[in-house]
Amino acid sequence: MNIGVFIPIGNNGWLLSENAPQYMPSFELNKQITLKAEQHGLDFVLSMIKLRGFGGKTEFWDHNLESFTLMAGLAAVTSRIKLYATAPTLCLPPAIVARMASTIDSISNGRFGLNLVTGWQRPEYAQMGLWPGDEYFGRRYEYLSEYAQVLRELWETGRSDLKGEFFQMEDCRLSPRPQAEMKIICAGQSAAGMAFTATYADYNFCFGKGVNTPTAFAPTVERLEEAKAKTGRDVSSYVLFMVISDETDEAARAKWEHYKAGADAEAIAWLGLQGAADTKSGADTNIRQMADPTSAVNINMGTLVGSHATVAALLDEVVTVPGTGGVLLVFDDFLKGLDDFGTKIQPLMRSRRHVTGEALAEVA
């Protein structure tokens, strides 16, 4: 099972809580996190893009770095780990993104890939005059399909003449092209998002569900399996989880309860308001899960709470779901959490024995 880290490009990571660690994003912090991930044998890191936050007492995600420039910097200081940036497709033309990706591919010597997002939070784009109108909610993946076609044509042939509804290329050129096959991630959970992923992407990222229910996401993976059966492409699912661990189950649970007790109600209310703005999509989108009040303190991602041994066992259960290629992890405290994962959790995981074995071989 592959394991990656969703690095904190925005302030405070993924906890909307006054009781959680409070910090600003910086290149130095993300460099330390990425180097630790590489040191512990993890497979990749991914950075999101967020152009406007949720406010509240914690100013949640009001402070953010930019994804491509961050990953370009990380590409220059790493040697093995794979790096994925996120493209806000309403802001950046596909030909420019194709060239930026090719540049970071060169910096990283073929270790770069791309996450495509359609944009769901109107204020992010309206503030720049780039929101195309609320009818876009229902046509996001039509737009993204043309976008991906341009990317694929430029990366694979160096040229695009696509004439679509949203993009019109006229002998558009790209050189140099990426040295490695450029992998695309999508995180769409709607039927349209799944169909897009099955047609154009290589990985589908989905939310884990619940607390200590590591296989509850299985129905989402089943839906992707059905979608990719229609296209015949090899696409695997990766699942997002937050890890809150400690020496004992009780200590980890106490931290989780403490974070929940400090939930930033104002920021959570803003999340709910933005989620409700999309009246075009169905009930199966990511934002519907994120805004659910059940566990909005960490945007309702799957949460693994327990001792190091408990978390290791829970993660080993994830890979038992057919079609699952790996997990994307976030931590309440990234630096300590990553070290604990690398030294106390990963060595106990059956699904990561190949990594611990490689580490022992290097020492020998």
UniProtKB/Swiss-Prot annotation:
InterPro entries: Luciferase-like_dom (IPR011251), Luciferase-like_sf (IPR036661), Pyrimidine_monooxygenase_RutA (IPR019914), SsuD_RutA_monooxygenase (IPR050172). FMN binds at residues 49-50, 115, 124, 140-141, 190. GO terms for biological process: alkanesulfonate catabolic process; nitrogen utilization; uracil catabolic process. Keywords: Flavoprotein, FMN, Monooxygenase, NADP, Oxidoreductase. The keyword Flavoprotein applies. GO terms for molecular function: alkanesulfonate monooxygenase activity; uracil oxygenase activity. Its EC number is 1.14.99.46. The FMN-N(5)-oxide reacts spontaneously with NADH to produce FMN. Requires the flavin reductase RutF to regenerate FMN in vivo. The keyword GTP-binding does not apply. Belongs to the NtaA/SnaA/DszA monooxygenase family. RutA subfamily. SUPFAM superfamilies: Bacterial luciferase-like. Pfam families: Bac_luciferase. This is Pyrimidine monooxygenase RutA. It is an enzyme of class 1 (oxidoreductase). Disulfide bonds: none annotated. It catalyses: uracil + FMNH2 + NADH + O2 = (Z)-3-ureidoacrylate + FMN + NAD(+) + H2O + H(+); thymine + FMNH2 + NADH + O2 = (Z)-2-methylureidoacrylate + FMN + NAD(+) + H2O + H(+). It comes from the Bacteria.
